[in-house]
């Protein structure tokens, strides 16, 4: 993944790895909440450009950014969401640190099968951004989106892993696509999850 340098307030995107191929839309920094903009990379790069996955619909949209605008990093922490078993598995390298039951999207707004990174971290006690109690006290925003919704609450329909104040629904299909965890489980995951943590949602 790549983290935008703090002195770059707006990350310019390019359609191809050429200076003249500027796209109209870029990405603000910080974003999407607090914290430096963090984007998923594809592994493709040139001397001056790096290809990224842009956090827009449709999922998998790519663009190029200038190498000088970002720093590359990697994480050995991985969250696997198993939709069939409705559980989240936290890995550090090859070691399983915790397995946790989760609630997932309902039949109308299913949780999509995608790979993503954590591109936003939100903690109720530390943030000026208000989210309803339904989100619990902690949220890991993801770089991919619901494939059933065009927007959600006036924003892009980004997926997230978050806590909940309705733990009785853990293990069910009830959400708009997000993954819900018990407060205890998401607090444990938060000890290891950082911006750039990989998330793999499996069928």
Regions found by a protein language model. Give the residues of each.
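Glycine-rich catalytic cores of cysteine/serine-nucleophile enzymes that process amide/ester linkages
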Residues: 97-107
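SH3/SH3-like beta-barrel superfamily modules
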Residues: 30-68
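Gly/Thr-rich phosphate-binding beta-strand-loop-beta motif of the actin/hexokinase/Hsp70
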Residues: 88
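Boundary regions of SH3-family modules and the immediately adjacent low-complexity/disordered segments
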Residues: 1, 53-81, 92, 104
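Exported/periplasmic cell-wall-interacting domains
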Residues: 69-77, 106-113, 125-203
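Extracytoplasmic
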Residues: 7-10, 45-49, 60, 74-76, ...
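Beta-loop motif signature
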Residues: 1-41
